[in-house]
């Protein structure tokens, strides 16, 4: 009995030590959270000191590009609108190739293998763009990295439109992909680091909405230029308009305040915070205090050698808190990509042609898939923080499976003799699959942008972004070969559907909840041992199952949605 108690005590001590080790000098962060909860005087002292420094420096920066609103919340919406336009560019450039696919191969004399490389060139380039994410974010900041990505978008689109051979079109697609990869990993972090926690998940989800909107616009552009000579050139070059608008819009936006503190530019961070969040609201003052304490404690830990100062990447292997975030975020991304969504998006017009539509009809019918994805993102934008991350992950994956089953079954009927059955089943499955994926896709940007510690966030997003586009490249490049090897039903139902089924089991057990938490509180969540999270999730599953079986639907859905957004993770100092 004594030995058992001793082992139990040792386990508790080991877990405490693990938390302290994983978070380095996070005692300062814990204390900052407690000060914020109890309204300590330290918060006002910090704000007063920053105001004094601001007065000595001559006040807030003035100038043509220094936009300021009477109500800081209006600045938040401006910031999110322009930053998230990167999602629109990304989605637009992903779907434009679908319409161009009907004409480009014949005009340039491409083989089937060469056309696969053209389609997969952008996700391949995006892997390279993701690898640029860390150095670009560390040396140029979040804002600078976004501007660089826009320049790459512009160069790539211009070269695409003017391509005269296979080498030129592939090169332009890779350059375009560099912009997609760099921007895709930067914008969600930029938004997550600048907006208030209660709407963070909703506004990061807006990025996915813009991706879906861009994909719909891409299909619409394909339809507009369908009967124009040289149509695919106009289709691929149309994104130049949006990249130009976004470039000028980004010039008016500030740098991320968390990044500025990370760079030891505390006064600049305070200036930005005052412009975009204000200091009149108590919650905003508390969040600035906690953010400052958290980032400073991380930087001190690095400086004192508690972490791998020269090789920050190593913390993903040596620090349990960072490792948990890396494993979870990247498995979640893989589960989405390996269900084939990007292959379906890129080959949408070709797939429509395979089930009986002519080229013109195929282009128009592509709007069905893109429109379903767009509509599917809307609930997540408004309800991400209300229902939480686990709800969206666990309820969306079964929708993938059902949609893929219908798509797979549709291939079992003869297009020549049962055309209506084939098209009915296929389109129904496509609508269900894309609709459910719209909400899940929001998580692939929300979760990676919030789970990594500040000093590793750009490195973490590099791995997540690179993995996302690497999986997209693999799925897209091998789509035709896999379809020929497995059969259309085997690929849709067996492979893609099987991934969705496995993913559901993983999310049920291993996905922690991070809704309504500051980025600093999420540090605490991922400092807990994985088995603690699994036990907590399993207890929640049993309770939810019991409530559903006994007819208490109100407690499962309504009460969860009414959770007080001010609820925060409690930190024990025992």
Curated annotation (Swiss-Prot):
The answer to whether keyword Hydrolase applies is: no
Q: Which GO terms describe its cellular component?
A: plasma membrane
Q: Which residues lie on this side of the membrane: Extracellular?
A: 98-115, 165-173, 227-233, 352-363, 412-426, 487-490
Which compartment or compartments is the protein found in?
Cell membrane
Induction context = Expressed during growth on endosperm tissue. Repressed in conditions of high nitrogen.
Molecular-function annotations in GO: myo-inositol transmembrane transporter activity
| Phenotype reported upon loss of the gene | Abolishes synthesis of the polyketide mycotoxin fumonisin B1 (FB1), severely decreases macroconidia production, results in hydrogen peroxide sensitivity, and decreases virulence in maize kernels.
Describe the task this protein carries out: Transporter for myo-inositol. Also appears to transport the polyketide mycotoxin fumonisin B1 (FB1). Does not appear to transport hexose sugars.
Indicate what this protein is called per its UniProt record. Myo-inositol transporter FST1
């Amino acid at each position: 009995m004594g030995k058992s108690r001793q082992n139990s005590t040792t386990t508790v001590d080991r877990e405490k030590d693990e938390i302290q080790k994983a978070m380095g000098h996070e005692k300062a962060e814990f204390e900052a959270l407690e000060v914020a909860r109890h309204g300590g005087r330290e918060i006002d002292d910090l704000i007063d000191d920053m105001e004094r420094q601001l007065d000595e420096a001559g006040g807030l920066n003035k100038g043509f590009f220094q936009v300021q609103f009477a109500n800081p919340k209006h600045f938040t919406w401006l910031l999110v609108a322009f930053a998230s336009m990167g999602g629109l560019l990304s989605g637009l450039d992903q779907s434009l190739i679908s319409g161009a696919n009907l004409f480009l191969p014949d005009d340039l004399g491409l083989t089937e293998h060469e056309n696969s490389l053209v389609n997969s060139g952008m996700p391949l380039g995006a892997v390279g763009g993701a690898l640029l994410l860390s150095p670009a974010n560390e040396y140029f900041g979040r804002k600078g990295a976004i501007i660089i990505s826009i320049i790459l978008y512009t160069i790539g689109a211009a070269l695409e439109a003017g391509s005269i051979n296979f080498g030129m079109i592939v090169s332009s697609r890779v350059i375009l992909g560099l912009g997609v990869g760099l921007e895709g990993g930067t914008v969600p972090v930029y938004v997550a680091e600048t907006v208030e926690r209660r709407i963070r998940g909703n506004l990061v989800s807006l990025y996915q909405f813009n991706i879906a909107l861009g994909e719909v616009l891409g299909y619409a552009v394909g339809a507009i230029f369908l009967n124009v000579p040289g149509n695919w050139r106009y289709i691929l070059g149309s994104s130049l308009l949006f990249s130009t608008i976004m470039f000028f819009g980004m010039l008016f936006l500030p740098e991320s305040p968390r990044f500025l503190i990370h760079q030891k530019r505390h006064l600049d961070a305070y200036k930005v915070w005052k412009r975009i969040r204000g200091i009149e609201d108590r919650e905003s003052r508390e969040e600035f205090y906690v953010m400052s304490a958290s980032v400073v404690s991380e930087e001190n830990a690095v400086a004192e050698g508690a972490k791998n100062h020269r090789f920050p990447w190593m913390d993903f292997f040596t620090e349990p808190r960072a490792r948990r975030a890396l494993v979870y975020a990247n498995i979640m991304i893989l589960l989405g990509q390996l269900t084939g969504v990007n292959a379906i998006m890129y080959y949408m017009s070709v797939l429509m042609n395979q089930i009986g539509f002519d080229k013109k009809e195929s282009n128009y019918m592509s709007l069905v898939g893109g429109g379903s994805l767009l509509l599917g993102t809307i609930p997540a934008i408004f309800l991400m923080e209300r229902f939480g991350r686990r709800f969206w992950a666990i309820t969306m994956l079964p929708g993938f499976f059902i949609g893929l089953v219908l798509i797979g079954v549709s291939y079992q009927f003869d297009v020549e003799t049962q055309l209506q059955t084939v098209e009915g089943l296929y389109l129904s499955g496509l609508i269900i699959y894309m609709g459910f994926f719209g909400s899940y896709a929001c998580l692939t940007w929300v979760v990676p942008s919030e789970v990594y510690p500040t000093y590793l966030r750009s490195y973490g997003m590099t791995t997540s972004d690179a993995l996302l586009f690497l999986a997209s490249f693999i799925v897209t490049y091998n789509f035709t070969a896999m379809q020929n090897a497995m059969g259309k039903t085997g690929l849709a139902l067996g492979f893609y559907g099987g991934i969705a089924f496995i993913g559901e089991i993983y999310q049920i057990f291993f996905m922690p909840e991070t809704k309504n938490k500051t980025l600093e509180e999420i540090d605490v969540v991922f400092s807990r041992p994985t088995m603690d999270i699994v036990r907590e999730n399993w207890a929640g599953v049993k309770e939810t199952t019991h409530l559903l079986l006994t007819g208490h639907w109100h407690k499962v859905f309504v009460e969860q949605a009414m959770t007080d957004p001010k609820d925060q993770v409690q930190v024990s100092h025992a």
